[in-house]
Amino acid sequence: MKVVEVKHPLVRHKIGLMREGNISTKRFRELAAEVGSLLTYEATADFETEKVTIDGWNGPVEIEQIKGKKVTVVPILRAGLGMMDGVLEHVPSARISVVGIYRDEETLEPVPYFEKLASDMPSRIALVVDPMLATGGSMISTIDLLKERGCTAIKALVLVAAPEGVAALEKAHPDIELYTASIDDCLNEQGYILPGLGDAGDKIFGTK
């Protein structure tokens, strides 16, 4: 599995700001979208382009456009919605495919409860977004579902990842790509990433 920990200074700075314990909902939400945007820039760097001729202001002009598979953005509810606007800044015409999964706080196992995917998944590149890759369960379940629907080109974008989650994802889906702003130290006994960001969903939405 290709793992990219984005070390751009802007990413390091912004993810550092998100670690503040008493950060406001507004600020956390803004930063989640901003880092999501920067991760998307990195994740789309290998997209192929093709030359086309258009009518310019002074006659025909040759330009480059993205070619190949179209994109679907797949936010994992609910926290993944906090990154979606940042992703769409770069791929505004992408279809949105939504997957609802929550983590059982006792077993730490993923529990799916909703899905609404683009109808043409085999012809799309999926950018799966979720702020946290902790145990990896939610991400693995989402990618399982995408593959069942025929999607073969998948990139996962997360703000913060635990080594345990990275290892679990690589074991389950070695053929995907992972982009993250930080691979943190470890998980605690409750399955939270340390030092992490806390509960990203609560901080993005302002509700527990």
Swiss-Prot record:
GO biological process, one term: uracil salvage
Enzymatic reactions: UMP + diphosphate = 5-phospho-alpha-D-ribose 1-diphosphate + uracil
MF (Gene Ontology): GTP binding; magnesium ion binding; uracil phosphoribosyltransferase activity
CDD domains hit by this protein: PRTases_typeI (cd06223)
Pfam families noted in UniProt: UPRTase
Transmembrane segments: none
Binding annotation for uracil: I193, G198, D199, A200
Activity control, per UniProt: Allosterically activated by GTP.
Free-text cofactor note: Binds 1 Mg(2+) ion per subunit. The magnesium is bound as Mg-PRPP.
The EC number(s) this enzyme carries: 2.4.2.9
Pathway per the UniProt entry: Pyrimidine metabolism; UMP biosynthesis via salvage pathway; UMP from uracil: step 1/1
InterPro entries, per the entry: PRibTrfase_dom, PRTase-like, Upp_B, UPRTase/APRTase, Ura_phspho_trans
Protein keywords: Allosteric enzyme, Glycosyltransferase, GTP-binding, Magnesium, Nucleotide-binding, Transferase
Binding site for 5-phospho-alpha-D-ribose 1-diphosphate: R78, R103, D130, P131, M132, L133, A134, T135, G136, G137, S138, D199
Cofactor(s) needed for function: Mg(2+)
Family: Belongs to the UPRTase family.
Function recorded in the entry: Catalyzes the conversion of uracil and 5-phospho-alpha-D-ribose 1-diphosphate (PRPP) to UMP and diphosphate.
Protein name: Uracil phosphoribosyltransferase
Upper taxonomic lineage: Bacteria, Pseudomonadati, Pseudomonadota, Gammaproteobacteria, Alteromonadales
